[in-house]
Amino acid sequence: MHARAGIIATSLVGLVALAGALAGCSGDANAAGGQDKTELVFATPPGTDDPNEQAIFKDLATMVGEASGRTVSNLQPADYLGVVEAVRNGSVDVAVLSQFSAALAYKTDSVDPLLVWGASTEPASFCLARKDSGIQSAADVKGKQVAFIDPGSTTGYFMPKSMFTKAGLVDGTDYKSTFAGSHDSAVLAMANGNVDVACTARQLYPTFIQKGVIKEDDVTIIAKSDPIPVGISIVVRKDLDNEAREALKAKLPAMLAGNAEIAKTLGISGEPVKDPEFSTYAPLVDVAESIGVDLDDLR
């Protein structure tokens, strides 16, 4: 589930500046502290410029408002870890977090997870190459350049990089990598020959074909990652009032499940776990460690 086309890859150093900008947008969010607020600021991860996807996120924000009984404004920070920082510093009250962003946020005590859905059985990521490149499998990536999405992206970084690691390939030694900043940008860079391979979310692949971003006859799916061991999370700032928390837990799951487009976009099915323990996210920590990433280092 993801920065917009054309955005240059955001370094982790830039998170502080992003957090400051968000704080300015949210007015006195920090001053409100644990006090009840009549308006909630809701954030979603970066996605694509697809108007349909943007409309789905607006519908999601509306549901958060209906479930909580509050007025809701919506933000979409430019990178995945920016969402974590915005919740941590009080600029955002409620957010959807991708799997590794949620694990990071929980591990660093930055947010309170309210809801987390179960794992999918589908591959998380597809890695693509031009058909005329001669790249047919993960093993062929040796000596090539790969476009990942963002340091906090589950489908655009952690899962595909883990796949290459399992294939015996070490980033920086066996292949070079770059962060494209968005799924669109990574796929376009591959299609235009600027990189050899682009790794993106499985569910975005048919969208890119339908929208004409790439032609199916021109690309090869060279590898598919494992499924993500944990689903998407809804999190809140740590001092959000109990009334809003309980209302969201009670009402939001059924509302999301009842909207087929939202459920598909977020990859949710079944009943979520409410107030999950950190052990729920432990499989994600294992994946991060397998590729040499300590989630604490991403703060």
Question: What function would you assign to each model-found segment?
Answer:
Residues 1-12:
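Bacterial N-terminal signal peptides that target proteins for export
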Residues 36-43, 48-65, 229-230, 235-236, ...:
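An extracytoplasmic/periplasmic, membrane-proximal ligand-sensing/linker region
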Residues 93-94, 113, 196-197:
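Short, Asp-centered acidic motifs that coordinate Mg2+ and/or phosphate
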Residues 37, 42-63, 77, 100, ...:
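Bilobed "Venus flytrap"/periplasmic-binding protein-like clamshell domains
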Residues 20-24:
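C-terminal motif of bacterial Sec signal peptides marking the signal peptidase cleavage site
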Residues 26-29:
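Bacterial signal peptide processing site
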Residues 111-120, 175-176, 209-227:
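Short beta-strand->loop
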Residues 66-75, 91, 166-180, 215-218, ...:
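A local structural motif
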